[in-house]
Amino acid sequence: SVPGDPIDILWQQLAILKQLIAHSAGRLRLCLSAADIERCREDKVLAMVAHIEGAGGFDGEGRDLQAFYAAGVRSIGPFWNIANRFGSGVNGSFPGSPDTGPGLTAAGIDLIKQVNALKMQIDVSHMNEKAFWDTAHHATSPLVATHSNAHALCPQPRNLTDQQLRAIRDSGGVVGVNFGNAFLRADGRRDSDTPLTTIVRHIDYLINIMGEDHVALGSDFDGITLPDELGDVAGLPRLINTLRASGYDQLVLDKLLWRNWLRVLKNVWQQ
């Protein structure tokens, strides 16, 4: 956690993001629509969607949510791992169940309804199981887990059960695979000797449960330990080559790399 008022910190981070865009000489764009993303693809520049993980500092009336939406935020995860006024995040140690506490509060249900009204993406990645099912009940758009893996392969509380995976599939949503060692490995360790085939194993499993239209890359390049073979975002071509060597053709690779995300964002944003 970062000391200070969480709303002030969010505004500072958003200001930094906009400074990066201003200094990018047009190579980075903040996207507010699926059409914006498609233009970035055509122009061969980086497309960015502003996302907030953890709404703990938000007021319960929707003013903060409205303000960040007006500033360009189009995706939100109500929780990190800890509880806030909206409900409980997922916590607990490995191995463990995602059923770690109560679900959404009344304010949390209101938040989901406010997000629905704004047609923002809702991220379930850091929700415990009860909050997940509460969100599934109240959400009006496809469910999205931006950076989560299969609990059956790595029983971290943060990973998703088969039942949750099916619910995301049935909503028309997507799961973005997390590259963090601790969320990939069957032993739950953070060791970076994790082979890229472990990521492929999770993708295989998710596709078997959900189908190839509901799985994507999620990454989580943010303070986690990663496989040495991957390193950082520059290592993605090595992962793509590993997927090709594992039998994935270009049609499915395109879905994993961008098509599934774009389809879901179009549906969420209703464009």
Curated annotation (Swiss-Prot):
GO terms for molecular function: metallodipeptidase activity. It comes from the Bacteria. Pfam families: Peptidase_M19. One of its GO terms (biological process) is proteolysis. Belongs to the metallo-dependent hydrolases superfamily. Peptidase M19 family. This is Uncharacterized protein in pqqA 5'region. The lineage of its organism: Bacteria, Pseudomonadati, Pseudomonadota, Gammaproteobacteria, Enterobacterales.
